[in-house]
UniProtKB/Swiss-Prot annotation:
The EC number(s) this enzyme carries: 1.1.1.37
SUPFAM superfamilies: LDH C-terminal domain-like, NAD(P)-binding Rossmann-fold domains
Chemical reaction(s) catalysed: (S)-malate + NAD(+) = oxaloacetate + NADH + H(+)
Protein species of origin: Francisella tularensis subsp. mediasiatica (strain FSC147)
Annotated NAD(+) binding sites: 10-15, 34, 96, 119-121
GO terms (BP aspect): lactate metabolic process; tricarboxylic acid cycle
Name the UniProt record assigns to this protein: Malate dehydrogenase
Domain of life: Bacteria
NCBIfam families: MalateDH_bact (TIGR01763), PRK06223.1 (NF004863)
Function: Catalyzes the reversible oxidation of malate to oxaloacetate.
Annotated gene: mdh
Top-level EC class as recorded in UniProt: oxidoreductase
Length: 319
């Protein structure tokens, strides 16, 4: 059986971490693409030299040529300008649209059948732009957002309750920004809902509210601490989990920015936004789950925020 090919467009902190995780998990051969001369090649050589130590036997190479995307099974896109202190995801819009155009055309001409995962921010708009320029069908392109946001939610809950994070199931829907919706109703600890934990006095409502707020600003918290960049370990781990579900046909249900059809969650148009999504060898399939009236209202606010940014993106493209 031929080995799978995973191409990482953008060889920065997230791209390099993605490559390392892909090797450790033995997902396939790795190509690191970046426009910076020498940098992807240097990282690829460094990563290749970890293979004897890790006990894996895969190829890793760096490139500046979009032709090397040819026959990729998975393409994970992190290219773009990263967030800086005081910069919102939305500030990145104009710059990164141009990046998505270049990357999208590279995918279109070299690997139109690849499964594409977008990580570039502002996420919900960038995955929309990437599809526009690449022509990849709805079921073969998705944005990495909810897996990361949910991981942050789970981490904060586990820390607050002093339990194993593996016992915490928590989900976040909506746009990958300040309007995201951590689902307190369907989230649980070892099967016990957060609402029940609050009723039993094991979790104070004000602490839960603080955790929800911290989850929404989780990315910004890390940006403020790092001062010179943004998160990359957890975003890379999230992207690899999604890629692995596709490559191994795991059919995992993960919160992702998938193309949600009009009619689902009250949408009046097709829209990339974070919802529970099955990822299999056939690609992505958004799933509608029951949420509370309050969460539905919050989700609508988030949907409107994504739609507003899409309008701004359309105006930028029209100039």
């Amino acid at each position: 059986m031929a080995r799978k090919k995973i191409t990482l467009v953008g060889a920065g902190n997230i791209g390099g971490t993605l490559a390392h995780l892909a090797l450790i998990k033995q997902l396939g051969d790795v190509v690191l693409f970046d426009i910076a001369q020498g940098m992807p090649n240097g990282k690829a050589l460094d990563l290749l030299q970890t293979c004897p130590i890790e006990g894996v036997d895969f190829k890793v190479r760096g490139t500046n040529d979009y032709k090397d995307l040819e026959n990729s099974d998975v393409v994970i896109v992190t290219a773009g300008v990263p967030r800086k202190p005081g910069m919102s995801r939305d500030d990145l819009l104009g710059i990164n649209i141009k990046v998505m155009q270049t990357v999208g055309e590279g995918i279109k001409h070299n690997c139109p059948n690849a499964f594409v995962i977008c990580i570039t921010n502002p996420l919900d708009i960038m995955v929309n732009m990437l599809q526009k320029f690449s022509g990849v069908p709805d079921n073969k392109i998705v944005g990495m957002a909810g897996v990361l946001d949910s991981a942050r939610f789970r981490t904060f809950l586990a820390d607050e309750l002093n339990v194993s994070v593996q016992q915490v199931q928590a989900y976040v829907m909506g746009g990958h920004g300040d309007t995201m919706v951590p689902l307190t109703k369907m989230s649980n600890v070892a099967g016990v809902s957060l609402e029940q934990l609050v009723k039993e006095g094991k979790l104070k409502q004000e602490r839960l509210d603080a955790i929800v707020s911290r989850t929404r600003s989780g990315g910004g918290e890390i940006v403020a601490l790092l001062k010179t960049g943004s998160a990359y370990y957890a975003p890379a781990a999230a992207g690899i989990q999604m890629a692995e579900s596709f490559l191994k046909d795991k059919k995992m249900i993960l919160p992702c920015a998938a193309k949600v059809k009009a009619g689902m969650y009250g949408l009046d148009e097709d829209l990339f936004v974070g919802v529970p999504t099955e990822i299999s060898a056939n690609g992505v399939r958004p799933i509608e789950v029951e949420i509370s009236d309050k969460e539905r209202e919050q989700l609508q606010v988030s949907i409107n925020a994504v739609k507003d940014l899409n309008k701004v993106a359309a105006e930028i493209l029209a100039k």
